[in-house]
From Swiss-Prot:
Gene Ontology CC terms: extracellular region
Gene: hag2
Descriptive protein name: Hemagglutinin 2
Species this chain originates from: Eikenella corrodens
Task performed by this protein: Induces agglutination of neuraminidase-treated erythrocytes.
Keywords (A to Z) from UniProt: Hemagglutinin, Secreted
Localization: Secreted
Length: 212
């Protein structure tokens, strides 16, 4: 607040003929001047410690500027990190082994690789090499052939066993009818059955009528 405005608002009176030789301000009969002074003390001096200084705003602005330049510096650092990550990915064993396996697939020994072999020689590599296992198809066919051989062997063994049984029966029952030897249990035989009221449709002598 400027001093001239303070003088205008207080409406003070000047007494040039006072006891002292200097010009003084008489505010004894003006009751508003104390309120202005108290209001000034109340609004500024008592609350001064609780308000932020104007100088701090200047530091905040400078701090924002520092953060702004730090952001660009951090972005450059992050970009350098991406370049380093790409460089590491190019020489990483997994990607190099994967590229070598796609170009030249081969079976590898299960050994831990101390370094990446970039000479397209994948005899020694990691334990689980990333590759296209083209030999699995032949393994499936080979397994199918093995199972087919097993089934064929079982069928051949069954046929041989059946032939042996037939030969044994033929040699033993040479004089017996051929139909009875080869098809046991399939010849006709007489079967006696008892019905509810009569037996064999009244053609048997085992029934009783009025003789009881």
């Amino acid at each position: 607040m400027h001093f001239t405005q303070f003088m205008g608002q207080a409406s003070v009176e000047q007494d040039t003929f006072g006891s002292s030789g200097f010009t003084r301000i008489n505010v004894g009969r003006n009751t508003d001047i104390t309120v202005q002074i108290n209001r000034g003390f109340t609004s500024h001096f008592n609350r001064l410690s609780k308000l932020e200084a104007e100088v701090r705003e200047g530091f905040v602005g400078f701090s924002h500027a520092v953060y702004f330049f730090t952001f660009f510096h951090g972005a450059a650092t992050a970009f350098c990190g991406i370049n380093q990550l790409i460089g590491q990915a190019q020489i990483h064993g997994f990607f190099a082994t994967l590229a070598g396996c796609i170009a030249h697939p081969a079976h590898c020994q299960g050994q831990t690789a101390g370094r990446t072999n970039l000479n397209r020689n994948l005899v020694v590599s990691t334990t689980n090499t990333a590759a296209f296992h083209f030999h699995d198809g032949f393994g499936i066919v080979d397994g199918f052939v093995k199972h087919f051989d097993c089934l064929f062997a079982l069928y051949f063994l069954g046929s041989l066993l059946q032939s042996t049984i037939h030969d044994a029966l033929v040699n033993r029952f040479f004089t017996v009818n051929h139909q009875g030897i080869h098809k046991l249990g399939q010849f006709n035989a007489a079967e006696l059955r008892i019905r509810q009221y009569v037996a064999l449709r009244d053609f048997s002598t085992s029934w009783h009528f009025n003789f009881l």
